[in-house]
């Protein structure tokens, strides 16, 4: 089945707990709220299990931007100690989102969505893409402006990659714009150039990508962004049991 039962997932958590794990767990799902009914059945079970053991785990997952429209879901996730969520924002350019058929990202202002999730005590991680068809010059700067405005600490960037057996691949193949075959298409978008002929010069896209990445992680700008972001985060409603720091934690502070 597409989703695990609450009983199965809680049993898996118990196995990790019995093995001595006490850190973060990433629930790997392209969209944790894709089946809202099942997610809302699961979350209270996780919360109860966590409460009984002093909240030994923190959770991270992936979700669509419309998580921001569901206050109940955000509250339930926070109460189960979901500390972070990865959003595929892709780009602040609405025309590019429409080209990519990511219509759920165009229904409401993206910066407001990030702020609502943040206010519920869930840290937003986000992915951004450069190189969409019809993209106007300056896309990299617009991503930097958006990340700076919202304060998102962890912003991943990549250049668009066409993957086999997708609508994008089929369209580009029909248009004769692919520059590599299926065997070479690995989907790595942070260290590779686009694997198709874009609608604007590839040199411009590559330069914007590098400049944007450097701007996002310039040390002073990054620290300012992280500081401003955590000032906006809602305080946790759960209370984890006190625990002694590990030697790894102590070495990190020295």
What are these model-derived regions, one by one?
Residues 97-100, 168, 196:
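Short clusters of hydrophobic/aromatic residues that line enzyme substrate/ligand-binding pockets
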Residues 155-161:
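Glycine-rich phosphate-binding active-site loops on the catalytic face of alpha/beta enzymes
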Residues 1-125, 130-145:
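Radical SAM [4Fe-4S] cluster-binding motif and immediate context
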Residues 82, 111-114, 144-145, 163, ...:
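Flexible glycine/proline-rich, aromatic-decorated loop/lid segments
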Residues 16, 34, 49, 150, ...:
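Phosphate/oxyanion-binding loops and surfaces in catalytic or ligand/nucleic-acid-binding neighborhoods
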Residues 30, 65, 160, 200-201:
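Structured loop/turn residues at secondary-structure junctions
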Residues 177, 181-184, 189-254:
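Radical SAM enzyme core and accessory elements
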Residues 145-154:
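Basic phosphate/pyrophosphate-binding loop/patch that engages nucleotide-derived ligands
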């Amino acid at each position: 089945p597409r989703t695990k039962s609450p009983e199965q997932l809680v049993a898996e958590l118990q196995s990790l707990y019995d093995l001595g794990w006490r850190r973060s767990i990433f629930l790997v799902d392209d969209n944790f709220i894709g089946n809202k009914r099942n997610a809302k059945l699961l979350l209270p079970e996780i919360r109860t299990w966590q409460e009984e053991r002093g909240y030994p785990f923190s959770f991270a997952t992936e979700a669509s931007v419309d998580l921001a429209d569901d206050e109940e879901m955000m509250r339930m996730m926070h109460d189960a100690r979901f500390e972070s969520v990865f959003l595929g924002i892709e780009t602040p350019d609405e025309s590019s989102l429409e080209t990519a058929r990511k219509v759920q990202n165009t229904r409401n202002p993206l910066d407001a969505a990030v702020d609502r999730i943040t206010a519920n005590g869930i840290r937003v991680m986000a992915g951004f893409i450069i190189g969409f068809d019809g993209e106007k010059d300056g896309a990299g700067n617009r991503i930097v402006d958006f990340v700076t405005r919202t304060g998102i600490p962890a912003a991943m960037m990549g250049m668009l990659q066409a993957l086999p057996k997708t609508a994008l691949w089929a369209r580009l193949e029909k248009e004769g714009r692919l520059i590599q075959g299926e065997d070479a298409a690995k989907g790595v978008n942070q260290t590779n150039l686009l694997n198709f002929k874009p609608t604007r010069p590839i040199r411009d896209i590559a330069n914007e990508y590098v400049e944007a990445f450097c701007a996002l992680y310039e040390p002073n700008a990054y620290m300012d962004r992280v500081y401003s972001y955590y000032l906006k985060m809602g305080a946790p409603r759960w209370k984890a049991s006190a625990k002694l720091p590990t030697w790894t934690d102590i070495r990190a502070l020295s």
